[in-house]
């Protein structure tokens, strides 16, 4: 994505993360090391740190409300990647999947990293058997 972002001079296909540490920081760092820009959409909470140092300064945004932050994540998304995480990650993931399933959001590539984690957390087969998830909702499964 950063290569495409560089080709458009940072106008399209820009890496966007939650601006925090860990995997989010790695995404911003990768964009910076490639000479690109990246967006950080941070949430203002008493226990949260400041945005990571690799977010492009002019593209660092602080949100007080989760709903508005999620809206900004999803309205421009060309792909969604989700790594193992807690309740915040689950909330963002299921909101995005619901919006895609109900046609409120354009269908985009949706990639879950860490198959073993997701298979333990979500019983995909049980959802399909209960007709709550359809095979048309799922794409290729890769390890």
Segments (PLM) and residue ranges:
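Short, acidic/small-residue loops that bind anionic groups at enzyme active sites
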Residues: 35-48, 83, 97-121
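Alpha-helix termini
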Residues: 2-10, 100-104, 132
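Glycine-rich beta-alpha loop segments
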Residues: 1-41
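Active-site/ligand-binding-proximal alpha/beta "capping" segment
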Residues: 64-111
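Single conserved hydrophobic/aromatic residue that forms the stacking wall/gate
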Residues: 134-143
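Glycine-rich, charge-decorated loop segments at or immediately adjacent to ligand/cofactor-binding or catalytic sites
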Residues: 26, 118-129
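Glycine-rich oxoanion-binding loops at beta->alpha junctions
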Residues: 46-75
